[in-house]
Amino acid sequence: MTHYLDAAVEAARAAGDLLRQNFKRPLRVNVAEAHDIKLEVDVQTQDLITKLLLKKFPHHALYGEEGTVGDQSSEHQWVVDPLDGTVNYYYRIPHFCVSIALRFKGEIIVGVIYDPMREELWTGQKGESPRLNGHNFRVSERADLAEAVISVGLSKTGIMIESNIPLLQQMVHRARKCRVMGSAALDMAYVACGRFDAYLEQGISLWDIAAGWILVETAGGTVDVRPRKDTKDKYSIIASNGVIDLGL
C-alpha cells in the first residue's frame, strides 16, 4: 500500500506547487455563483494530479470535483479535490489545500492532505498511524464541549446554508469557540491532529472529506457520514475526537 501513498504524496506536492505559484497571479474565473467560485486553476490542478496518478496506475479511476476519468466501477478509485478552499484562494486568503484519497472496493485506504502555504502534509493509510510532516499525531482528548473548538461548514447553496446555520448557532453558545474556515479538508485534518475537537457540516461532497476521513479515524477519532436525501451526492458529516459530547 505504501506505493499508493507515495504516489498520492508526489501528486499532492506537485499540485500544491502549482497552486502556490499561481496564488498571487491574476486568476481566470470559469464560473461565479452566489456562494462559490470555479477557477481555471482548479481544472489545471486536477489535470496535473490525474496525469501523475494514472500514469502510474492506468487501470485506476479518478473521481474529482472537476470531473471523472476512467471506469468508476473500478476496484481502485482516486477521490480528489485539487483545490479545497477555492473562494479563500481567489480572495488571497492563504487557507486552502490539496486533498487526495484512494478507495479500494469502496473503502478509503489512503489519504493525503497538503497545505502548500504552511508546508503541512498530512498522510494516512489503513492500519497505520497517520503523520504530519513525518510525525505521528492523534486527535485531542477534550470531552467537555465548553472547552472545545468546533468547526462548522456553511456549504454553498441556500438550502444547505439554512441547514448549517442552526448547527452553528448551537455550537456558538455551547463551545469555547467556533470557526468557519472555508476548507472542509483542512477542517478534517485539524480534527485529526487535535487542533479542532469536531467538524460539522450539512451538504458536503465526498471529495471534500475522503482523505480527511481516514486521517481522523486512524488518529483515533470518529467520522459519521450520512447521504442526504434532498441532494444527490451530498452528505452530512460529524467528525470528532470520539470522546466529546456534542449533544446532537
Name the predicted role of every residue range.
Residues 42, 65, 81-84, 88, ...:
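Acidic active-site catalytic centers that drive phospho-/nucleotidyl reactions
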Residues 72-131:
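DPxDG-like acidic metal-binding loop motif
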Residues 35, 118, 231-234:
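Short acidic/glycine-enriched loop/turn segments that link adjacent beta-strands
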Residues 19, 42, 53, 86, ...:
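Residue-level signal for inorganic ion chemistry
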Residues 138-248:
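An extended, acidic
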Residues 30, 70-72, 105, 141-144, ...:
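Solvent-exposed alpha-helices and their adjacent loops that cap or buttress functional pockets
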Residues 1-83:
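N-terminal subdomain of lithium-sensitive/metallo-dependent phosphomonoesterases centered on the IMPase/IPPase/PAP
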